[in-house]
């Protein structure tokens, strides 16, 4: 694919919603928009699998990764959803405010009535320019034989697009934060925003921090997972002591067992709950889950005095806390 230089096609009929997006007092809403787009992309891929038009890879686990780089002042949003071809990038990205979700729902409306596709990809995507001087997209479509696409724009009406190097189906969006928005290169600030907008999104969202020297943690070897990056294996011999028994005889007693541990690259932090209480029957919920839900939603360290959870015919549910 040859590198292409072009101009964004602005849909004048929808320019006012775009302007309103830029006028939001809460400029952190770009996080919600980009996460919503990633959820849409994953939902679409799963629907194609359900319709028999695509077969998900064995062991497929839908996920969204948010990676903060406080040195380079970048923020990445990565999903393993449907991805895009070059033609789709042209259609859904360079033509601002065109709704790819609407077109998709029209085609699959009989199969997706019970699902939520969240809005206009083009419009939500451009909220990224509320905080970034430049935005890059690297994407690979699920379609057989598709080539990876790289797209970048510096916030003007011009963009460059060419062949990318992504090898996994899905999309990676990189924001080069402007000077006024370096707060979003802080992992704690980004976690705060994710918890504000995305605590109950239906796809697992993982937050991590990119660093030249990787952050590490030590776990028990039995807790090692396939996707863990092992740095070092650590064996600790059992500790023993000489003690006197009831007969006055000395004997060797084990005071701590041998341990096999592993130093791994720190795992990304899961920041949302994909199985919120309102999606469960009251009989499936524990007392501690209700208390934790109350603390998380109402930001109150105290415990509620009591609560009522009614789960009637879909889509009605009711929570009441005191």
Task: Provide a role label for each language-model segment.
Residues 1-179, 183-184, 192, 199, ...:
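GHKL (Bergerat-fold) ATPase N-terminal catalytic module, capturing the glycine-rich phosphate-binding loop
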């Amino acid at each position: 694919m040859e590198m292409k230089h072009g101009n964004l096609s602005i849909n004048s009929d929808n320019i006012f919603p775009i302007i309103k997006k830029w006028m939001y007092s809460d400029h952190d809403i770009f996080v919600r928009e980009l996460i919503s787009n990633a959820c849409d992309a994953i939902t679409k891929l799963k629907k194609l699998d359900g319709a028999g038009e695509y077969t998900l890879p064995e062991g497929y686990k839908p996920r969204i990764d948010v990676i903060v780089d406080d040195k380079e002042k970048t923020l990445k949003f990565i999903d393993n959803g449907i991805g895009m071809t070059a033609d789709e990038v042209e259609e859904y990205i360079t033509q601002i405010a065109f709704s790819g979700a609407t077109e998709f729902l029209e085609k699959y409306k009989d199969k997706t009535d019970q699902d939520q596709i969240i809005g206009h990809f083009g419009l939500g995507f451009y909220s990224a320019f509320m905080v970034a001087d430049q935005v890059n997209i690297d994407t690979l479509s699920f379609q057989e034989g598709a080539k990876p696409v790289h797209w970048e724009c510096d916030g003007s009406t011009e963009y460059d697009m060419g062949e990318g190097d992504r090898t996994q189906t899905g999309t990676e969006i990189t924001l080069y934060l402007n000077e006024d928005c370096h707060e979003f290169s802080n992992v704690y600030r980004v976690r705060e925003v994710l918890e504000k907008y995305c605590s109950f999104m239906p796809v697992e969202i993982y937050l991590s921090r990119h660093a030249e020297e990787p952050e590490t943690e030590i776990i028990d070897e039995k807790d090692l997972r396939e996707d863990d990056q092992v740095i070092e294996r650590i064996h600790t011999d059992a500790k023993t002591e000489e003690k006197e028994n009831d007969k006055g005889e000395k004997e060797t007693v084990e005071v701590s067992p041998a341990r096999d541990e592993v130093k791994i690259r720190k795992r990304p932090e899961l920041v949302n709950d994909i199985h919120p209480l309102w999606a469960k029957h009251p009989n499936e919920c524990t007392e501690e889950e209700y208390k934790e839900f109350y603390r998380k939603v109402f930001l109150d360290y105290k415990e509620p005095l009591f609560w009522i959870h009614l789960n009637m015919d879909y889509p009605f549910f009711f929570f009441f806390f005191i």
